[in-house]
Amino acid sequence: MEKLYGIPKFAQMENITHQDATYYGKEVEIIVDYAFSRLFNVQIELQQWKSGDSLFKEFIDQGKEGLHSIGIYVDNLDSYIGEFKKRGIDVLQTGQIGKYKFVYLDTEETFGALLEIGETLKRKRKK
């Protein structure tokens, strides 16, 4: 991919544990390897499931390959979750890695892939 598309080398992170993770509302421990790069202004994220009940394991158990989800960054994760819930779209999985908090929404049937919505948590200002 690097040569063909001219994208930078992938930055790799191994054995990353998702903090505060839930899968269908149940607390779980999820461990994943990640690799990140960019193609123009699009982030490419490769994931390799290591352990724990999760949408990643479910995807593999169903014999699927390829695109798992499309992610977007937002400023206020909770407001987006609320808006999707109003439309009948539920949260399937949640987690946090460092300051990045994210959810996966049940959009596969209507959108063709799961939608990941994430927010980078900001420092609280001292008053």
Question: Which sequence ranges carry the predicted segments?
Answer:
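Short, well-structured hydrophobic secondary-structure segments
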Residues: 6-12, 19-20, 24-45
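Vicinal oxygen chelate
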Residues: 31-43, 59-76, 82-127
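Amphipathic alpha-helical segments
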Residues: 1-8, 80-87
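Structured loop/turn residues at beta-strand edges in well-structured enzyme cores
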Residues: 5, 65, 112
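A cross-kingdom feature marking solvent-exposed beta-strand/loop segments within repeated
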Residues: 14-29, 52-63, 67, 87, ...
